[in-house]
Structure formats: C-alpha cells, structure tokens
C-alpha cells in the first residue's frame, strides 16, 4: 500500500483541555523540549517522505500554532518539495487571528503556502463550547471568527466536530445550517486514547448521526483514500469520520510522525519507530527512507492490530494520549 499522506505533529502542548481528549489538568508527562524534533529535523523528515512520493502533508499537534517556527516550517516545506501539492494545518483556531508585526497568523500561513486549514469546533453554543474545552465562553467567538477568516482567504476549510452524547449531539443540523459550501463539516466519532476517559456509552455512531441530519444526499468521491463519508445537506457539505463503527483501514494511506519523532503507521497502534534517534545517530536520508519503508511494511491491516473497535478501546492504555500522537 502506498502512503502518500504524511501527518506531522509539531508539539504536544495545547491551549485547550477538551474533555474527549485529556483530563482537566492536561497531560502531565509531556516530552522535554530537547527530545522533540527541531525545526531542521522536522523539515528533513518531511523532505524524505516527499522524495518518496508523499504529496499531501498536514501539520498537527497538540496545537501547532503554539510553535513559534510554524510559518518557517510551512515555507520550507513548499520551497523544498515541489511534489507536495497540499499543505494543511489542523488547529483549534484560537491563535489564527493573533498578530505578529501587524500580520495575522492566518495570513502568514496562507502566504507561506498553506492551502488547507481544519479547525476543531465542537459546539455552536458558547456555554457548551466552554464546558467541552474547559475554557471561557468568551473565547468561542474567536474560533468562529477564525473559521470565517480562513474561508474569506479562499483556503480549503473544514470544521472538525467530535460528537459526544450528552454534549453536542443535538447540534448537527445547526452546524449544517451555519456555513455554505465554502466551509465543509466533518462529524467525528469519539475515539479511545490513553487518558481521555473513553466511555462507549457516550459514543454517537455514524448511523445515529445520520438520523439527525434529514435530507442528506450522498456525494461521490474521486479520492479512493478519503477516510470521510461525504454528503450534501442543502448548501453544506457534511462528512463523517467513522473510525469506530465503520472502519476505513483498507484504504488508509496515512502515516504519522509524532512531535518527538516517532513514526506511527496507525493512529490506534502502539508500535512506533524513533526517527529522531536515527537522525541524531547520523543516518543519511537514504538510510532514513529505508527505516521508514521497513516500518510501513509491518503495518497492521486494521485498528493497529487490535482486531476491532472494541479491541482498540480495551487496549487504549497501551497507546499514547492524543496530544502525544497528533490529531
């Protein structure tokens, strides 16, 4: 299987404390800064993947906008890798409108070559947002404004919403009415990871989400590796990421590199290979590429080798917290 989509986490830190991701006190055993990939190491890893054919790169976290060299990394990716045709960012949007030398971060990112921004937003209600993120309700508008700013720049914008029973499952129709086709929506099934207190009773499966959005029309996809099931709802495009109820492992072409340089071939798998240690041990780019290919050849068929969704949940403690993997 060819893996043309690389997701690189730039940091384990986050400025939110979302209930489905981590405890209120956050993840307390974050990796020391000197053990995270440096700017140059991030760029080198991406260059090796790009030369092997990766054409799509997404930068994640933690919260990637907390990393001061973010814009420089984006510019280097586009400068050094003409084969990278899509450069994306997944963010909570809290810092996109912050300014440095009078320039908004979102504008600097667009100028550096970022063409796709996914913004995490789990509620249109400020109080629900506050409860789910454990942050003040006053910050809710900041995220909404950031989404609109991304759309106004002509970026490919998606809103990612994790649907959680008892919190936001009644908002799906409101989300579909909030934006036109310039902002795509993706509703995500809650997934189990170490430290996120996963409770299967609070999972809202794809089939149930569908009942909350009447008049959906299926939208054919020309991307065989797309993990999202796409539909139209009026003027909106609505997608579902169904990792727990209907896996898409057979067509997954994604590979992840964590902020500490660990290569993970599956989001749910506990297996990893340290590219950081190889880099700091003096390997050549060719040797690094061979190490990556060897790891990819051992990728499990589905669910990181845990059999099914129930197995993923049972073995979540073996995996990292989400902020230490990368969204």
Where are the regions a protein language model picked out?
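Canonical Radical SAM [4Fe-4S] cluster-binding loop centered on the CxxxCxxC motif
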Residues: 1-39
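Glycine-centered loop/turn positions within well-structured domains
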Residues: 16, 126-127, 247, 273
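Residue-level recognition of short loop/turn positions
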Residues: 17, 61, 92, 260-261
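A short, flexible beta-alpha/helix-coil linker loop
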Residues: 25-29, 126, 191-194, 273
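Glycine-rich, proline-tolerant flexible connector loops at the mouths of alpha/beta enzymes
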Residues: 33, 63-64
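Radical SAM/AdoMet-radical enzyme domain recognition
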Residues: 39-59, 67-178, 182-186
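Radical SAM enzyme [4Fe-4S]-AdoMet core and its adjacent flexible, acidic
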Residues: 127-132, 136-239, 243, 277, ...
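Radical SAM enzyme core and accessory elements
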Residues: 247, 251-327
